[in-house]
């Protein structure tokens, strides 16, 4: 959402930038970034971890979501965690934040996939996961707050709010390569500033109507109650000082190791995944405070 707003409100232009916003599933986005086709991405720390352990130089410079802020939506008829036993749950890509959210969420519900005969299916991107749920290919899946309202509007109720568990987890952040940061420091700083201003615009109550209109347009929501829920969830998601959360990254590394997703994650420190230098500069110069004045 901060990127949509930064684009629509001309914030990028104020920094002499005109980025093309492209929706690509996170795993493919990272591949494109490694290839040099894309310079920036909003990706989870799990994808950065996979890139780093494979020898890449990707790093996270802003932290946009520092907890697992997902909702579990289910097909009609599923009323409790017990009803999920023997069912199929879509997890997106095997090593993404959505997969991690699913593991943690099922654990919070007292469920163990193998013991409870829950089949975890790699359903791909968010639109593909939605289609699988709507068509009956899966029985449940976790969705982020914006998309959850679309799923709810289609008649698939929310069973569990993982965000209320407050699990520290760097679910999303602004990612680029360390090489690009060194070669293009002004572009990196200006793009980060524009994204931060976009987030501050979303969080400012005076801009609520503009933000709600953007949500309605981009997510094709029309019911006022759904729009209000989506707005509230989005406005509350991004920290006022969106720096990478080292504790949240440590949680990512631990979960990836525990679930056998990437054993090499155990060899890394949070600082191997995040570059805090730009955030420190913006904090020291008072930028974070100024955008919220």
What are these regions (language model features)?
Residues 20, 27-28, 118-121, 229-235, ...:
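Short linear loop/turn motifs
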Residues 1-125, 129-135, 139-145, 158-168:
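Short, glycine-/small- and polar/acidic-enriched structural segments
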